[in-house]
């Protein structure tokens, strides 16, 4: 709760609808990863080591078992927007604090990204995002949406540029 804190606990549908209202869209998973990496090839956009000054994650003040006890980012829960330095593209808060939804569906069964176009893959079943009604139900293997970036209550490993989470 606070004007400078990120919006949290938003469904994928609400995030998509907000973007549509603003005449925008959620980024694809490929677009998000390109943006967060900021032109780097390291584990995290700032390098390969975490000191606690790069983003908000489950650190020494976190009460969960997955905490990283050796570092502190200075926040027990969410941090005010802009509390950490930007990535090389000048983008703030791309990792940690709260997860970020992307457009893609997760295809567990077929491992879409092994067979997808290498440049700008659209993600499996993008047509489902503009369709409504029972005939639009995804296949058994495509039932999850993807979020990226990690959050204040996630391990530091989830801040990796390549990490992905999924939810129904």
Residue ranges of model-derived segments:
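Short surface loop/edge beta-strand patches of beta-sandwich-type extracellular domains
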Residues: 168
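Functional-site microenvironments in short loops/helix caps that host divalent-cation chemistry
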Residues: 1-165
């Amino acid at each position: 709760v606070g004007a400078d804190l990120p919006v949290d606990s938003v469904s994928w549908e609400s995030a998509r609808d907000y973007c549509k209202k603003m005449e925008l869209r959620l980024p694809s998973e490929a677009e998000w990863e390109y943006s967060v990496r900021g032109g780097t090839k390291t584990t995290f956009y700032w390098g390969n080591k975490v000191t606690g000054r790069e983003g908000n994650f489950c650190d020494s003040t976190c009460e969960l078992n997955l905490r990283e006890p050796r570092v502190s980012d200075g926040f027990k829960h969410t941090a005010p927007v802009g509390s950490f330095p930007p990535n090389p593209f000048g983008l703030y808060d791309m990792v940690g604090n709260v997860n970020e939804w992307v457009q893609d569906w997760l295809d567990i069964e077929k491992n879409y990204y092994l067979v997808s176009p290498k440049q700008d893959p659209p993600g499996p079943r993008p047509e489902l995002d503009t369709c409504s009604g029972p005939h639009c139900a995804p296949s058994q293997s495509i039932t999850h949406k993807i979020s990226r970036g990690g959050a204040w209550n996630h391990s530091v490993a989830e801040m990796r540029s390549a990490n992905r989470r999924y939810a129904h």
